[in-house]
């Protein structure tokens, strides 16, 4: 996994928590779940390099590769399934004061289906938060959540704020799991008001190293789109996602925060910029087209993902900048272009020609309008 390039995000310097005691109380012992996944692994490596942190404990149910273990540096790896009560012993014996829960998965494991995934996600979170509640040393819990909790609907607001409810709450898949997990995290905050619970709703992530449903969907030579729809996409560069998690871990700012890049990209623009060929199909036919793409290894689209590809989703990130004090380095368009470059996608249609035609069209429209 290549993580070269700009390190993700930066503090804005105008956070309202900068003068508070929370900003001065850095974590001493941090436990990171999902440490063998992209975000958990790289976050562990970053935190292990921070001299302000005394100890980092990386937890996952599978053993890390030699390369990942080397990248974790001085962090201690503990092989544990967070669904097992053993996680409480790890937290208690390690005198952990900060827990970063980054283990929730959006795709089903090879063995088992949707039911297994839900158990991994929801039951794992329940057991972990119960362990945090019982551990007097725990003072911070950071939850990696997702913008998918808002769903996607043709009647959605232009921007989702953290206080906006979904018009039609997701009823299945990773989005439903994330809604449930957030609920358990808020329950922990009510039962232990001395714990600062931070929930980060990450926009759809993309980048050269991270494998996501969206990156696989856009990697095929032909990209099916819903006829008559052009989704508005707000993205988040993989390095900015890491930066936001790191910022939340160090800042200890309680609350729920939308995390996304500035600007949007339309689905049609994304397809053109990557040199793919769009294939408009009726919404009802997307399932059949996806079955063919699945056979050629590109992706699998569930109901919530189909809604996202039809309508998109954009969040208001004012609270992220002003209260969390974090600002992503990559805009949505820059994040997408970095994904295209980093993946080495061979254009079916030269994007430079497409952009040239777009520029000429804009110039012509301006001349006609003047």
Name the predicted role of every residue range:
Residues 242-304, 317, 336-337, 346-360, ...:
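Mid/C-terminal beta-alpha module of Rossmann-like enzyme folds, strongest
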Residues 27-50:
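N-terminal Rossmann NAD(P)H-binding glycine-rich loop of SDR-like oxidoreductase domains
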Residues 177-180, 210-213, 226-250, 255:
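Substrate-positioning beta->alpha
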Residues 170-198:
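Active-site Tyr-X1-5-Lys
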Residues 110, 165-171, 215-240:
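A conserved pocket-lining segment of Rossmann-fold NAD(P)-dependent short-chain dehydrogenase/reductase
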Residues 126-174:
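Conserved Rossmann-fold NAD(P)-dependent oxidoreductase catalytic core, especially the SDR/UDP-sugar
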Residues 76-123, 134, 152:
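NAD(P)H-binding glycine-rich loop region in Rossmannoid oxidoreductase-like domains
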Residues 149-150, 173, 195-216:
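Flexible, glycine-rich beta-alpha linker
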């Amino acid at each position: 996994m290549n993580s070269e390039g700009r390190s993700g995000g930066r503090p804005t310097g105008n956070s309202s928590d900068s003068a508070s005691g929370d900003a001065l109380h850095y974590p001493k012992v941090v436990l990171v779940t999902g440490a063998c996944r992209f975000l958990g692994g790289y976050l562990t490596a970053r935190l292990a390099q921070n001299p302000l942190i005394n100890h980092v404990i990386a937890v996952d149910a599978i053993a890390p590769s030699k390369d990942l273990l080397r990248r974790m540096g001085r962090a201690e790896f503990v092989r544990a399934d967070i669904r097992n009560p053993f996680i409480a012993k790890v937290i208690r014996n390690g005198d952990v004061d900060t827990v970063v829960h980054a283990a929730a998965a959006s795709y089903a494991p090879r063995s088992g289906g949707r039911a297994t995934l839900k158990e991994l996600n929801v039951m794992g979170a329940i057991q972990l938060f119960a362990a945090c509640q019982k551990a007097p040393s725990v003072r911070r819990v950071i939850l990696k959540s997702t913008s998918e909790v808002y769903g996607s609907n043709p009647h959605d607001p232009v921007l989702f704020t953290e206080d906006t409810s979904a018009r039609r709450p997701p009823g299945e898949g990773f989005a439903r799991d994330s809604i449930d997990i957030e609920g358990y995290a808020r329950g922990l905050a009510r039962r232990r008001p001395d714990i600062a619970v931070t929930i980060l709703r990450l926009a759809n992530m993309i980048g050269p190293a991270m494998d996501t449903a969206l990156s696989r969907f856009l990697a095929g030579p032909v990209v099916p789109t819903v006829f008559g729809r052009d989704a508005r996409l707000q993205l988040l560069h993989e390095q900015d996602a890491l930066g936001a998690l790191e910022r939340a871990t160090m800042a200890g700012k309680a609350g729920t925060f939308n995390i996304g890049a500035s600007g949007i990209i339309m689905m049609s623009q994304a397809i053109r910029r990557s040199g793919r060929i769009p294939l408009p199909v009726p919404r009802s036919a997307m399932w059949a087209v996806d079955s063919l793409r699945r056979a050629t290894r590109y992706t699998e689209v569930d109901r919530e993902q189909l809604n996202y590809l039809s309508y998109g989703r954009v969040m208001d990130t004012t609270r992220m900048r002003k209260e969390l004090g974090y600002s992503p380095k990559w805009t949505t368009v820059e994040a997408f272009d970095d994904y295209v470059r980093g993946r080495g996608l061979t254009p079916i249609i030269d994007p430079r020609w497409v952009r040239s035609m777009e520029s000429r069209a804009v110039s012509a429209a301006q001349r006609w309008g003047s």
